[in-house]
Structures are given as structure tokens and as C-alpha cells.
A protein has these predicted regions:
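Residue-level recognition of oxygen-bearing side chains
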Residues: 5, 35, 162
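Central regulatory/effector-binding core of bacterial HTH transcription factors
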Residues: 25-88
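N-terminal Rossmann-like NAD(P) cofactor-binding module of classical short-chain dehydrogenase/reductase
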Residues: 3, 77, 175
Length: 194
């Protein structure tokens, strides 16, 4: 009976160890741009952590693209194609940008009804000092303009989240990713079909 108990216990331990080997464990470092990380990824990471309790997650939010090949991070969620093209890539979501303004600003300056109406408005653009998290953050400045001209800006901000706050405070209009505006007060989509 004792030999059978020992063998049974060994099999139990073996099964337990086998189960642990098949479950992911260790540290996982994920990087993405600041705005996507703080507003989209952070609220969603809890589900992953519940499914993988043995994984310690580290989130690095930086608008500079970290180099995965030098192990600065294990996973990168990029808003555009990474510079190092030898990565395994998978599209996660479509990110749409629209032009937004605050109700206070739009009441004072009017609601644009056409692309040409945008020429009468103040614009906030993505500024210098930090790399843009997307390919063309200031597309709205050229929208409908001829000869590659741009609309004049009244303010530049080197953070997409900063653009949102400037728009909400009534400084002007700006192109902002839709994921950043969900459930945000004091913001209205302008020309929603553009």
C-alpha cells in the first residue's frame, strides 16, 4: 500500500508539474504609444492577466518605437508598420481619425458643413519634439487644400492626448483618433463623413 501511495503521489506531482509547464509564466513586456496604451490597452489588459495569472506584465508606453530585436520589449503594438520588418505582425484593430472640436469652440466659431469651411477655423496640430505615433498626424491641415498647402495652426502639441485636452478646452479643431474620444466630455466630431 505504501509503494502505491508513493507512486500515486509522484504521478500527482508529475501531473502538477506538467500542468505548470504548459501554462505560460514569466515576465512579458509590451510596448505601444502613450495614447493607445493609456486609453485602450490598459483597460483591456485585465482579461489577459486573469487568463494567464503566472505572467507578470510590464507595459511601456513610449511614442518612440522600441527595438524588439534587442529585447527592449517582447511585444510591440504599433500604430504603423514597424521599422524592423522581420517581426511576426498581426493587425489588431483599425484606428480611424476624425476632426473634433469642443461645443464651446463650435458655438463661438460655427460648425463646419463642408471641407472648405475648415479654412475659417483654428487648428491644433501635432508638434515637434516627439515622434508621431502615426504616419500623417496632420492630414486635416491639408484636407481639401491645393498645391500641397496647409492650413495655419494656432497651436502645436507633441502628444495626441495633449491634442485632445486642447480641443476640449476650446483652442480649436484637431484630427484625433476615435479611440481617444470615446466617453470623453466636451468633444464633438466635425464633418463625420470625412
Amino acid at each position: 500500500k505504501t509503494a502505491h501511495e508513493v507512486i500515486s503521489k509522484l504521478k500527482e506531482v508529475e501531473t502538477t508539474l506538467g500542468d505548470k509547464k504548459n501554462k505560460p509564466s514569466g515576465k512579458l513586456t509590451v510596448t505601444t504609444v502613450v495614447s493607445l496604451g493609456t486609453t485602450w490597452l490598459t483597460p483591456r489588459i485585465q482579461e489577459f492577466m486573469q487568463l494567464n495569472p503566472e505572467i507578470e506584465v510590464e507595459l511601456i508606453f513610449d511614442d518612440k518605437e522600441l527595438d524588439l530585436s534587442t529585447r527592449q520589449a517582447d511585444i510591440g503594438i504599433f500604430m504603423r508598420r514597424p521599422k524592423q520588418l522581420n517581426y511576426i505582425q498581426k493587425k489588431l484593430i483599425d484606428i480611424n481619425y476624425h476632426i473634433y472640436g469642443s461645443p464651446k469652440y463650435l458655438e463661438k466659431h460655427g460648425y463646419p458643413k463642408t471641407v472648405n469651411d475648415l479654412n475659417k477655423h483654428n487648428f491644433i496640430s501635432f508638434g515637434r519634439g516627439a515622434p508621431s505615433p502615426v504616419y500623417n498626424p496632420d492630414w486635416a491641415l491639408k484636407l481639401g487644400m491645393k498645391d500641397n498647402k496647409k492650413r495655419k495652426t494656432v497651436m502645436r502639441v507633441n502628444s495626441v492626448y495633449g491634442l485632445l485636452l486642447a480641443v476640449q478646452s476650446g483652442v480649436g479643431l484637431a484630427a484625433i483618433p476615435d479611440y481617444l474620444t470615446v466617453k470623453q466630455p466636451n468633444i464633438v466630431k466635425v464633418l463625420p463623413n470625412v
